[in-house]
Amino acid sequence: MPGDLNLKKSWHPGLHKNQAVVHAKEQEALEERRRIQERQKEIKQQRERDELQKLQEMATGKKRVQKVEWMYQDPTAVGSQQAFNEKKVDANSTDDYLLGKRRIDSIVKQKGDLEAFDDSLDRFQPKTDKSESAGIVHKVKDDPMVAVRQKGRELGYTDEANESERRSRRERSRSRERERRRPRRKREDSRDRRNRRDMEREGERRRRRRDGERTRRRERNRDPSPSVSDDDRGYRQSSREERDRKSSREEGGRSRSRDRYRNRSRERYRDRSREERSRDRSRERLRSRRDRDRDRDRDRDRDRDRDNVQSSGRSSGRSSVRSSARSERSLRDRSRSRDPDRDRDYRSRSRERDSGGGQGSDLSDEVGNGRSVLDERSTDMNASDGNSSHGYRADNEFSPSRSPVTRSHRDKRNSYRPEYKDEDDKRFAQRKDKEKEMNALPKGLQQMRAKLLASKKTTTVSGTSQTPTSAPSGSQRTPSAASGSSPTGKAATDAKLSDRLARLKAMQEDAKALEEERDERLASKTKHEEAERLRDALLRQKSAHLGRSEFAREEERKDLK
């Protein structure tokens, strides 16, 4: 049968390693217990001594002052009554011995050699109890700093030696650093000087070469002398060129290393200057962009302020007519861009108007009546629904606000009756508040409201468009009948709209109730989970405290109950 595989495990108690660890722990525990017993024994002895001293004080009636009496436990101390009573020692004798006024030779001559010397030694040594000395020894042994110093002494280290070694190491590193810095500066200075010298020499050489070439060219351009032949001139020129080539080759071989270093330094300078230039360029670009944006914002604010001042300063005339026409046109374009269904309705109405153009003056009367009705209805709709000022009334083709005469009349009215303008501002503020309330609704409710408003506008527009085409002859329908039919349609649309808004509010309340119910369910669920968690923790704690068998028995008893 194979051996026990558990012996392969590091935690197995049969291993010698684990047994040695257990033995060491047991020995430590025994040593600690022995120390505790010794300390308890010392405390007991001290208590007995204190009790005896208390009994002595009670018998004699003299109380012992326990402040600094440990300093006077030596019988040879100055003023010690025990010394005077037992050994009859002079009070100043110990001080004289310590100060060198008296000598020990007389004591040695009077008594025996060893006995007298031992007696003198006993005088100067403080007498302490064995228990106190043992406690001090134990404290010294347990002190970790004493152990560290002892170890250092054994190894031959001392604090002073370590400090001196550290200081010398620091000095060496500083001197090394100084030595490293000095020659580098010298080398750099000498290298710069050498480079400057080489550059000056090179420039001088080039200048000389240029001057020589110029003089040679001048001599060549002059008339050749009859005594000098072409061959001699060519030989001289070729030998001169060879000499120049040789000298340039030698100089190039000598200065190649210098040129290499010079090129490197120039490239480094070029790279650095290129980086600085690019950095400056980017800074300038950012600064110019910031200035441009600031100027643009300033101009825009100035133009806006000027427009506001001009629009508020205009009270009448062509300027007011033009500004109102421009604002109406912009509002109309904005509203058309917002709602494409209105453009469709406008096209259908224009087609119907073109098709019924042959009916004459009767049709124009009907159109006038419809114009007044639609103007009233559009104003009521804008006031009740909370639409913006550039809403249905601005898009209505029958609205009188599109005529310049009406606009100028309104501007004049606002100029000499400012309360009308205040009322318009109040109405506009109310509309804005309603728009904010509607925007605060959820997205689904906003979409449903937009659909309802669109359906309402289509119904009103279709009702107005049927008025001119339904009458075959304009003489049969009267303006009173047309004006009488409009309030009923308005009331019906208002009732529908209020009904749908009530439905929307009910849906919103239902959604809020559902959200609250969901939050309550989540809170109750978290509470139940927390209670279950606490119960499990308590059961686990109880089972660990009682033991598995007793806990199971208690659970069975609960189940039986």
Swiss-Prot record:
GO terms for biological process: mRNA splicing, via spliceosome. This is Pre-mRNA-splicing factor CWC25. Residues 122-132, 163-223, 230-308, 325-355, 413-438, 496-539, 547-561 have a biased composition (Basic and acidic residues). Residues 19-65, 326-389 form a coiled coil. The gene is CWC25. Keywords: Coiled coil, mRNA processing, mRNA splicing, Nucleus, Spliceosome. Associated with the spliceosome. Residues 380-390, 471-488 have a biased composition (Polar residues). The keyword Glycoprotein does not apply.
